[in-house]
Amino acid sequence: MKTTFRLMGIADVITLINGLLGVAALMFIILAVEELQNPYFADGVKTNYIWGAMTCILLSVIGDIIDGPIARRYSKRKLLGGTLDVMSDCVSFCVAPALLMFVMFGRWGEAAPIWSISLGIAACWVIVTGMLRLARFQYEEASDKVYFHGLASPANAMVLITAAALIWLQPSSGFGPDVS
C-alpha cells in the first residue's frame, strides 16, 4: 500500500505550498485585526500584515501558474493533483482575498452596520462564486473541452487585491496606512 506522499509529484508539492501560502495569508489577516476597534497602528505594524497577506496571495498565483505545466509534464497521479489544486485554489484565491477585502474596508467601530453587512455579503459572494467556478472547472476538465468560461480564480484574486491595494494607497480614500 502506497502512502499519500509517495503518490505526490513535484507539481503536487508546489500545489501544497500554494495552499500553505493561502493559509499564511489568512494568518496575516487575523494578525492584522487583532484589535478590531483599532486596526491601524501609527508604526505600521498592522499595515505590514495586510501587505504580507497580499504578498502571500501573489506568490500563490505565481505558484499556480507554474504548477499546471509541471503537472501536465511530470504528473504521477492526475486525480490527486487535481483535487489538491481545487482545495488550494479555494483557500488562496477565494477565502483569503474575500476576507482580506472584508478586513481592509470593514471600518470597525466607525461605519454604519449596513456597510459591514454589505461588505460581509460581498465577501461571501466572492467565496461562493469562486467555489462554484472551481467546481465547474473541475467538472468540465473531465470533458474534452479545451477552453473554460469565466474569470479564472487566480485572476479574480489578482483583480481584488490590485483594486484593494490601489484604494489602500490613496490617502484621501479614508482607508489604509495614512488614516489619522
What is each stretch, according to the model?
Residues 1-2, 145-180:
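C-terminal membrane-associated helical module and adjoining short loops/tails
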Residues 12-13, 44, 51, 55, ...:
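Multi-pass membrane catalytic core of lipid/isoprenoid biosynthesis enzymes
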Residues 23-26, 59, 63, 68, ...:
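Alpha-helical transmembrane segments of polytopic integral membrane proteins
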Residues 1-19, 70-90, 132-155:
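Interhelical loop and helix-boundary elements at the membrane-water interface
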Residues 24, 70-73, 91, 95, ...:
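Generic hydrophobic alpha-helical membrane-span motif
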Residues 92, 130, 139, 163-168:
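Non-catalytic alpha-helical coupling and interface elements of nucleotide-dependent molecular machines
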Residues 26-54, 98-121, 163-180:
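Helix-coil boundary and interhelical linker segments in multi-pass alpha-helical membrane proteins
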